[in-house]
């Protein structure tokens, strides 16, 4: 765990949950697993505060607990899961593109709340969608339920593990902490609910003394009975989203290298195996050309012969994204996911070197990568770059840890005159170094965004007050002159300052998302490589 990762975890926890949860979470990230009383003692927080903070972190899957041999419950932070909070906007946007506004709000609610029952999600999303509709229109619960079922069928949401039913005859002492289990076949099984009702608008005139709307409620709440899916909680399956991001990156890479038809064939192969292939698998399931041909999108008019030619072209490509086994029946084709990720990570490194040091350095990097080991004189000859420039470029990349220098002595005394000095590239080491820098960049971006917001806090509060006043006056039917007077409470210089702030914050947000895309590619490559070793 590097200092950059710990700092980023701290910023993310503080931004999402506040200071107390951030203090407990970062303490666990730094120290590893600890029992409750040790956490309270070390952080100087009260037991009640620690318990509440741990409840929040466990509910959002950011902390795990396990029973020690001596019966003590220890809590352990999941740093990698905390860092996934960076990707929340990307998860939500992806769901919007695949399943529309309803799917987007379902995933958003699950991410914001950690775990929820299906009935609670459906009700909340229906209410939110009804708020955005025209007067007189409402969102039916059944429509939201259908979107939820589609997300479960494609494994984007999954059930949370449950406490198993215990035998009532077993009167032994209860365990210090419950053990949560779930059958793999039940992870995506949606409970059969007959949710009848529509979304409701929040209006003061429709609320009773308790603050609850008087509109028609679902049948199961009328009798104050627990919902039929009480105890069955759902969460977002982040691994499935990562699989989708990886597939999109591979399809985009094939489109850039070849053409749109090739990328569509690869997309079809990935779509056919997305449910059957585990996210950590190095290869997809083998597919015949006939299966691929039958699964091509409707209206994609290419003949079987043309498809076979494209598959042969993809299989013969030096990058080896597609592998072929056997020739019977046209052969079986697989996508080599590990090699695809390695190519994407290498391309990312080349791009960074080109941006930082120029095209000549990128040429030298590609050359050393291709030849594995080269002396300085060989680099000069192969790259056709003058000796002085080549030396400067090699030392620049060496000092930044993009390339390595390997010493091979001819004699045991390691005398410089009798030693070969070979330049080489360790892609895994370079990827780790770049990943560390990406974490530092994201932390700097978040701090800058917080600074910009803090500097203009008074102006932002004034703007929000004016907007609230205008909204209430519009609702009561105020005249245009009155609205204009309220609007003029913010002066022209202040309005210009707000526009500048908005533009800067949008740039910082966009930069965070772009850096996170690089982080995802590098993390996927490192994880895939470590599993192969």
Curated annotation (Swiss-Prot):
Keyword ATP-binding: no
Protein family (similarity comment): Belongs to the eukaryotic RPC3/POLR3C RNA polymerase subunit family.
Subcellular location: Nucleus
Gene3D superfamilies: 6.10.140.1450, Winged helix-like DNA-binding domain superfamily/Winged helix DNA-binding domain
Organism lineage string: Eukaryota, Metazoa, Chordata, Craniata, Vertebrata
Quaternary structure annotation from Swiss-Prot or TrEMBL: Component of the RNA polymerase III complex consisting of 17 subunits: a ten-subunit horseshoe-shaped catalytic core composed of POLR3A/RPC1, POLR3B/RPC2, POLR1C/RPAC1, POLR1D/RPAC2, POLR3K/RPC10, POLR2E/RPABC1, POLR2F/RPABC2, POLR2H/RPABC3, POLR2K/RPABC4 and POLR2L/RPABC5; a mobile stalk composed of two subunits POLR3H/RPC8 and CRCP/RPC9, protruding from the core and functioning primarily in transcription initiation; and additional subunits homologous to general transcription factors of the RNA polymerase II machinery, POLR3C/RPC3-POLR3F/RPC6-POLR3G/RPC7 heterotrimer required for transcription initiation and POLR3D/RPC4-POLR3E/RPC5 heterodimer involved in both transcription initiation and termination.
Protein keywords: Antiviral defense, DNA-binding, DNA-directed RNA polymerase, Immunity, Innate immunity, Nucleotidyltransferase, Nucleus, Phosphoprotein, Transcription, Transferase
Chain's role: DNA-dependent RNA polymerase catalyzes the transcription of DNA into RNA using the four ribonucleoside triphosphates as substrates. Specific peripheric component of RNA polymerase III (Pol III) which synthesizes small non-coding RNAs including 5S rRNA, snRNAs, tRNAs and miRNAs from at least 500 distinct genomic loci. Part of POLR3C/RPC3-POLR3F/RPC6-POLR3G/RPC7 heterotrimer, coordinates the dynamics of Pol III stalk and clamp modules during the transition from apo to elongation state. Pol III plays a key role in sensing and limiting infection by intracellular bacteria and DNA viruses.
Residue spans of biased composition, Basic and acidic residues class: 211-227
Gene Ontology cellular component terms for the protein in this record: nucleoplasm; RNA polymerase III complex
InterPro entries assigned to the protein according to its UniProt record, in alphabetical order: POLR3C_WHD (IPR055207), RNA_pol_III_RPC82-rel_HTH (IPR013197), RNA_pol_III_Rpc82_C (IPR008806), RPC3 (IPR039748), WH-like_DNA-bd_sf (IPR036388)
Keyword Membrane (UniProt): no
Organism: Mus musculus (Mouse)
Protein known as: DNA-directed RNA polymerase III subunit RPC3
GO MF annotation, one: single-stranded DNA binding
Location of region: Disordered: 162-181, 197-228
């Amino acid at each position: 765990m590097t200092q950059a990762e710990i700092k980023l975890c701290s910023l993310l926890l503080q931004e999402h949950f506040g200071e107390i949860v951030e203090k407990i979470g970062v303490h666990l990230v730094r120290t590893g697993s600890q029992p409750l009383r040790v956490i309270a003692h070390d952080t100087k927080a009260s037991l009640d505060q620690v318990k509440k903070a741990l409840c929040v972190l466990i509910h959002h899957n950011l902390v795990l607990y396990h029973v020690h041999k001596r019966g003590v419950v220890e809590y352990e932070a999941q740093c990698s899961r905390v860092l996934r909070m960076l990707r929340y906007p990307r998860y939500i946007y992806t769901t919007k593109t695949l399943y529309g506004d309803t799917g987007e709000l379902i995933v958003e609610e699950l991410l914001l709340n950690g775990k929820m029952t299906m009935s609670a999600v459906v009700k909340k999303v229906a209410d939110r969608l009804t708020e955005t509709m025209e007067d007189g229109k409402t969102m039916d619960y059944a429509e939201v339920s259908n979107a939820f079922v589609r997300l479960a069928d494609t494994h984007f949401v999954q059930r949370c593990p449950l406490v198993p039913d215990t035998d009532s005859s077993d009167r032994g002492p209860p365990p210090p902490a419950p053990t949560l289990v779930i059958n793999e076949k039940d992870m995506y099984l949606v409970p059969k609910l007959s949710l009848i009702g529509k979304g409701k608008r929040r209006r003061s005139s429709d609320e009773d003394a308790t603050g609850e709307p008087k509109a028609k409620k679902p049948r199961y709440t009328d009798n104050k009975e627990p919902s039929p899916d009480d105890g069955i909680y759902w969460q977002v399956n982040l691994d499935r989203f990562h699989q989708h991001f990886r597939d999109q990156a591979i399809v985009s890479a094939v489109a850039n290298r070849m053409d749109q038809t090739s990328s569509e064939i690869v997309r079809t192969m990935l779509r056919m195996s997305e449910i059957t292939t585990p996210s950590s698998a190095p290869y997809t399931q083998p597919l015949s050309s006939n299966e691929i041909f039958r699964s091509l999108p409707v209206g994609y008019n290419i003949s079987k012969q043309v498809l076979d030619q494209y598959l042969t072209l993809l299989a013969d490509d030096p990058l080896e994204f597609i592998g072929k086994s056997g020739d019977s029946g046209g052969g079986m084709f697989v996508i080599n996911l590990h090699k695809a990720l390695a190519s994407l990570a290498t391309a990312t490194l080349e791009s960074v070197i080109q941006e930082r040091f120029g095209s000549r350095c990128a040429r030298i990097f590609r050359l050393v990568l291709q030849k594995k080991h080269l002396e300085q004189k060989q680099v000069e000859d192969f790259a056709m770059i003058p000796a002085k420039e080549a030396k400067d470029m090699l030392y620049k990349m060496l000092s930044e840890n993009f390339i390595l220098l390997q010493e091979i002595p001819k004699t045991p005394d390691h005398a410089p005159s009798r030693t070969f000095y070979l330049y080489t590239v360790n892609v895994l080491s370079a990827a780790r170094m770049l990943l560390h820098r990406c974490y530092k960049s994201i932390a700097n971006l978040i701090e800058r965004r917080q600074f910009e917001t803090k500097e203009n806090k008074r102006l932002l509060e004034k703007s929000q007050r004016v907007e609230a006043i205008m909204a209430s006056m519009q609702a009561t039917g105020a005249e245009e002159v009155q609205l204009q007077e309220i609007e003029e409470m913010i002066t022209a210089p202040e309005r210009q300052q707000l526009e500048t702030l908005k533009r800067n914050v949008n740039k910082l947000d966009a930069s965070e998302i772009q850096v996170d895309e690089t982080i995802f590619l590098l993390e996927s490559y490192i994880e895939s490589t470590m599993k192969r070793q």
